Amino acid sequence: MKSLQDASAESVGKPPPTVLVVADEVLVRMALSDYLRECGYNVVETGDAREAIEVMTSDVAVDVAFSDIVMPGTMDGFGLAQWIRRERPDIKVVLSAGVARSAKAAGELCEDGPALAKPYDHADLERRIRSLLAAAPKRD
């Protein structure tokens, strides 16, 4: 088992993981992004799936995408998750659902179980992200 000191030494010089937060509700997106930054993550915020795809097709190294399922525009969170699985399978996906049925269906598109059901605790999301990153191959 690695000590905290060993783990810190390995991460010296490496950028923190980047989380893409996709949420149309500005205050929710800001609060969640601030919390994740306090936890040590780089955070990129977008308000819809189109903006999220622009980020993921740019030079931004996204590790985890967190998205609401219900969003405005032509693509919802399910569509975004399907796009990520097809075009960017290196990016892990976490979805957030306000309806239990949607949360279960989202489990097929998320690597770590069903979607987080609203209202969720920010700490629950951070644990899910940490778990996904621990299981993922390390990026260079």
Where are these predicted regions, by residue range?
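Two-component signal transduction core modules
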Residues: 65, 115-116
